[in-house]
Design a protein with these regions (language model features):
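Conserved N-terminal phosphate-binding loop of PLP-dependent enzymes in the Aspartate aminotransferase
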Residues: 2-400
Length: 400
């Protein structure tokens, strides 16, 4: 395979890096649009986009221009001083989300950590015992200690226990279990409205409304994790805006595509939640720097007219995949929202991912049997048709 990692790259990483990643045998060199190219020049249609980060694909001319301009002006200042772009981006996020106040950080996990501190502070102002966080089984919120503590998958947690106390896990969409878990000690209810690492499973509107009701009843914060399922990917700014009626959280965390590859995470909160964090209680050295914020502002300018197209292409992609399922019996289900798509198989997914790599197609497997696709928002019907044609070829081989 022309894309097998060169010995120099692989050997250096084996010698000097922590061995925590199981990388695919591919060394990437450049990208353009929805495609990336390896060091041998082979082209790949990228349906995972840096795990949902590269929302506008690669080498987008408007982002490239902004990055070059800002790099020549100001990269970092710290939060000791103002710069020109944090305020406008915070306003953009507040208006897009329906919330009020923003905190900038560097990643989704860091945003979730800050949201949990917000919930802890909010709860302790009411009672020292109000520290419990209700989270969902099969969820994923990050790999830092707090985020891991509310991640409902044992495989991520077991090597680091005991974790932060107070987490209570309930099954997704089990309203009875949620009602039983909630009470006076509940500081927050946390959920992804579409579980990404968990296999692309959606939370129902009924469940989200019950979570909102219980948070109000017990004066807890409702926190929506939009790190993977939000920021345009569902065809709206955030996934909770697809609910009818919309369920507004107290706190929303987001990251991944916000600055299209430059690290940026956010906590967006209403006034009630934001009041829990005062001066000196939280901070970030790098969070919300001028480069990341300026790129994010440009991204939002590009995203606004793209939202209807995201919904359309996502629907078209799922339709084509469902057509494919009629011809391959091991495809159990196609599910998703916008351009967040899962194809559940009755066979292991990793061999499919490796065969796809061989055929110039990048995708990902989660939960052993779910092919996960988080493509760039600029994906076209032509790209979808190419992907489906390649998958049909790969599935024929797998079913032979």
């Amino acid at each position: 395979m022309a894309s097998i990692a060169s010995s120099s790259v692989a050997d250096l990483e084996k010698q000097f890096l922590l061995q925590n990643y199981a990388r695919y045998p591919l060394v990437l060199h450049r990208g353009k649009g929805c495609y990336v190219y390896d060091t041998a020049g082979k082209r790949y249609l990228d349906l995972i986009a840096g795990i949902g980060v590269n929302a506008l694909g690669y080498a987008h001319p408007r982002l490239t221009r902004v990055i070059r301009e800002q790099a020549a002006l100001l990269l970092h200042t710290s939060n000791l001083y103002y710069h020109e772009y944090q305020g406008p981006l915070a306003e953009r996020l507040a208006k897009a989300s329906g919330l009020n106040r923003v905190f900038f950080c560097n990643s989704g996990a860091e945003a979730m950590e800050g949201a949990l501190k917000m919930a802890r502070s909010h709860g302790r102002k009411i009672s020292p015992e109000k520290i419990e966080v209700i989270a969902l089984e099969n969820s994923f919120h990050g790999r830092t200690f707090g985020a891991l503590s509310i991640t409902g998958q044992e495989k991520y947690r077991r090597d680091f226990e005991p974790l932060v106390p107070g987490a209570r896990f309930v099954p997704r969409n089990d309203i009875g279990a949620l009602e039983q878990a909630a009470g006076g000690k509940t500081a927050a209810i946390v959920c992804e409205l579409v579980q990404g690492e968990g296999g692309i499973y959606a939370v129902t509107g009924e469940y989200a409304r019950k979570a909102r009701e219980l948070a109000d009843r017990y004066n807890a914060l409702l926190i929506f994790d939009e790190i993977q399922c939000g920021v345009g990917r569902p065809g709206t700014y955030f996934s909770y805006q697809r609910l009818d009626p919309v369920v507004l959280p107290d706190v929303m965390v987001a990251a991944k595509p916000l600055a299209c590859g430059i690290p940026l995470g956010v906590i967006v909160a209403n006034e009630k939640a934001a009041a829990a964090i005062g001066a000196g209680m939280h901070g970030s050295t790098f969070g919300g720097g001028p480069l990341a914020c300026r790129v994010a502002l440009e991204f939002f300018d590009i995203l606004d007219p793209l939202l209807p197209q995201i919904a359309h292409i996502g629907g078209y992609f799922r339709m084509r995949l469902n057509e494919l399922a009629k011809h391959h019996g091991f495809i159990r289900e196609v599910r998703g929202l916008g351009l967040m798509i899962g194809v559940e198989l009755e066979i292991p997914g990793k061999p499919i991912v490796l065969d796809a790599l061989e055929n110039g197609l990048l995708l990902n497997c989660t939960h052993e049997t779910v092919l996960r696709m988080l493509p760039p928002y600029i994906l076209t019907e032509k790209d979808v048709d190419r992907a489906v044609s390649l998958l049909n070829k790969i599935f024929k081989k797998a079913g032979a």
